[in-house]
A protein has these predicted regions:
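Hydrophobic membrane-insertion alpha-helices, especially the h-region
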Residues: 1-7
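Trp- and S/T/G-rich repeat-edge/linker motifs of beta-rich repeat architectures
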Residues: 8-20, 52-73, 104-117
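Tyrosine-centered aromatic motifs in long, intrinsically disordered, low-complexity repeat arrays
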Residues: 9, 35, 46, 50, ...
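Solvent-exposed interaction surfaces and binding hotspots enriched for charged
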Residues: 25-27, 36-40, 46
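Structural signature of eukaryotic scaffold interfaces centered on beta-propeller domains
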Residues: 25-30, 79-83
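Short beta-strand motif characteristic of blades in beta-propeller domains
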Residues: 33-40, 87-93
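Short loop/beta submotifs within extracellular cysteine-rich repeat domains
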Residues: 42-47, 54-55, 95-100, 107-108
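Short, solvent-exposed interaction modules
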Residues: 65-103
Length: 117
């Protein structure tokens, strides 16, 4: 399980010139309990799931553990849904490079990302 509370004022309320402003985006999926969190600067992805029942079903799991750009190059990434509610395209809007990824509630073996050529 992954938990990283934002308890630093500078991250919770970044200045307009900060690298954290507009960096992260949350996308709703067709599953009302699951969201995709995108770091739009480097392409990292997390599956975020919540529950109104208990804290045991709250989690944030990486789909893509590695940055998809080199040398801390700032890019703008976006995602687009595919026909399956579990699969999306991840697109580097600067270069046009694309990846296909899948989220899942079944476990890590069903969560993946691959370069689309």
């Amino acid at each position: 399980m992954f938990a990283a509370p934002i308890n630093m004022f500078s991250l919770a309320y970044p200045e307009k010139s900060s690298n954290w402003t507009n960096r992260f985006q949350m996308f709703a999926t067709q599953n009302m309990w699951t969201f995709i969190l995108l770091d739009s600067y480097n392409g990292r992805l997390w599956q975020v799931q919540y529950s109104t029942q208990d804290l045991d079903n709250l989690f944030c799991i990486p789909i893509n553990k590695y940055e998809l750009v080199e040398n801390n190059e700032r890019c703008i990434f976006s995602i687009q849904p595919l026909t399956s509610m579990y699969q999306y395209y991840l697109i580097n809007d600067n270069t046009g490079d694309m990846w296909k990824f899948q989220w899942s509630t079944k476990g890590d073996d069903y969560r993946w990302i691959e370069r689309f050529r």
